[in-house]
């Protein structure tokens, strides 16, 4: 007999709590998006944080968005930027784009050149929205 979804979830949680960062990343995404489980942003935050601390780029990206938007936690622009930088350094194009957006929001004139560098990296990695923002900054 195949295990139920609840039994599978218990095993996943146990593996995460035993220190499996990949399982923590999996659980964080499941709870963040509400896939196969009811959405629970508090649990998502906990599991994604664990995975992020082990260097999981997607977890860092999702956490960055949570801190940026205040979704499931208090908004924290500095923490969002830190997490997006970690994910961007691992090649996540949308994280590169978000780094640029936060830099521009913090201090447009001071951070413009650095933001453009991040937008170019994002665009070169195939994130088309970065092209649009680059043309807006140049235009």
State where each predicted segment sits:
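Helix-turn-helix repeat elements of alpha-solenoid scaffolds
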Residues: 1-6, 40-42, 76-77
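Terminal, low-structured helical/coil segments at or just beyond the last alpha-helical repeat
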Residues: 3, 123-139
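Short helix-capping/linker turns of helical repeat alpha-solenoids
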Residues: 18-21, 33-35, 40, 53-56, ...
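Hydrophobic face of amphipathic alpha-helices that form TPR/SEL1-like repeat modules
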Residues: 26-33, 37, 62-69, 98-105, ...
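TPR/TPR-like (Sel1-like) alpha-helical repeat modules
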Residues: 110-128
């Amino acid at each position: 007999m195949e295990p139920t979804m609840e039994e599978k979830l218990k095993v996943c949680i146990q593996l995460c709590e035993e220190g499996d960062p990949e399982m923590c990343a999996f659980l964080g995404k499941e709870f963040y998006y509400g896939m196969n489980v009811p959405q629970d942003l508090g649990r998502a935050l906990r599991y994604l944080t664990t995975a992020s601390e082990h260097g999981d780029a997607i977890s860092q990206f999702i956490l960055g968005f949570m801190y940026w938007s205040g979704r499931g936690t208090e908004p924290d622009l500095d923490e969002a930027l830190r997490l997006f930088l970690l994910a961007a350094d691992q090649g996540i194009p949308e994280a590169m784009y978000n780094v640029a957006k936060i830099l521009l929001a913090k201090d447009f004139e001071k951070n413009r050149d650095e933001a453009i560098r991040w937008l170019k990296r994002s665009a070169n990695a195939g994130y088309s929205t970065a092209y649009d923002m680059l043309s807006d900054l140049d235009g």
